[in-house]
Amino acid sequence: MHSIANSSAPVSRSVRDMPNSGSDSDDDDDFVPDAEPSHTAVVRSGLSKQGKDAVVATDDPSDSDSDSDADGAHSETQDKPAGASVRAAEQIDADELEALRKEREELVAAAGGEQRLGKRRRLAHVSESGADNQVTNDNEVQALKAKAAAEWEAIKASESGSSMNEQVTQSTATGDYASATTLASTARQEMVSIPTTYKFAGELHTSMRLLPRSHPDALKYLSSQIASPTSTTSSAPAPSASASAPLPTSPASTSTSSSPSRPQPARPTPRRKKPSSLSALSAAATTKPTKLNTLEKSKLDWDTYKSDHSQLSQQELDELEHQTKRGGKGLGDMKGYLDRSDFLDRVKNRTAQP
């Protein structure tokens, strides 16, 4: 208000200093034009439209009554719109907050979610989810391994049973009932351990082979084992007829002396010489052992290692048989290589010396 009054004061003085013209009346000296309030002052004061109309600036400094009235009106109008301006400001703040909230929601949706906004939040979320995923993955791996082992056992049992049934069925269909019976009995045959002596690098080695009882080598070995105890048993001496013992004579015998004589009993066969066990051992020792080359010796050592059940478990033996016979078909080159590497690592860890 003071700035408005000060700005209008020079205008009133200039009007008073101007000379009176012939067209002006005597009342022009007392005329003071009303000053319009500036837009800047109205904006700074925050007055509403009603306050703008009530503000009136006077140019006459001597009129104290008009100045006091104007000051009172200005104070009243300034007090009245204060609450309205505060409410308007609060409404503006609420609208701005709502707009900011909506804008943030749009940014979150465009970024792909709340967890992708900040790097720290994203890393913390990834670390927490990674630990949970690791535990879940370990449990899933263990469950898959157990399931695969169970399925492998079932497949192996079904394949062994189906192969034997197919052979028996084929033999029965062709009318070869003897071979069908042989195959059915072979499935239940017991294995026979046969010692084998061989020579390698100037040294004698003895290995044990497990063969079915129907194998020719097994039959030969069993026949030799049966013949050796039979030869060692002593045969009972045959009773010899005593020539010194006279036969009792009777009247009937004398009367029938003229009749043809009865046939004489057969003479006992001469006894064979009993072979000693030492001769059998010497014969076995004098037999020339089989000479092996490096490849045959390696194969024999590998077979001996596989036959030792104290070093390999049944599951490892089954896996070894599967890999040896089938060669990892259908698994792919890399898959078969990884399976073999894992198997060899397990065997190495199991058989490692402390």
Curated annotation (Swiss-Prot):
Polar residues bias spans: 1-11
Listed InterPro entries: BCNT-C, Swc5/CFDP1/2
Family affiliation: Belongs to the SWC5 family.
Main location: nucleus
Chain intervals with Low complexity compositional bias: 223-261, 276-292
Domain (BCNT-C) ranges: 272-354
Pfam families: BCNT
PANTHER family, per the entry: CRANIOFACIAL DEVELOPMENT PROTEIN 1 (PTHR48407:SF1)
Keywords, in A-Z order: Activator, Chromatin regulator, Nucleus, Transcription, Transcription regulation
Span list, region Disordered: 1-93, 109-134, 222-292
Superkingdom as given in the UniProt entry: Eukaryota
Species this protein is from: Mycosarcoma maydis (Corn smut fungus)
Record's protein name: SWR1-complex protein 5
Function comment: Component of the SWR1 complex which mediates the ATP-dependent exchange of histone H2A for the H2A variant HZT1 leading to transcriptional regulation of selected genes by chromatin remodeling. Involved in chromosome stability.
Bias (Acidic residues): 24-33, 60-70
Location within or outside the cell: Nucleus
Subunit and interaction comment: Component of the SWR1 chromatin remodeling complex.
One GO location term (cellular component): Swr1 complex
One GO term of the biological process aspect: chromatin remodeling
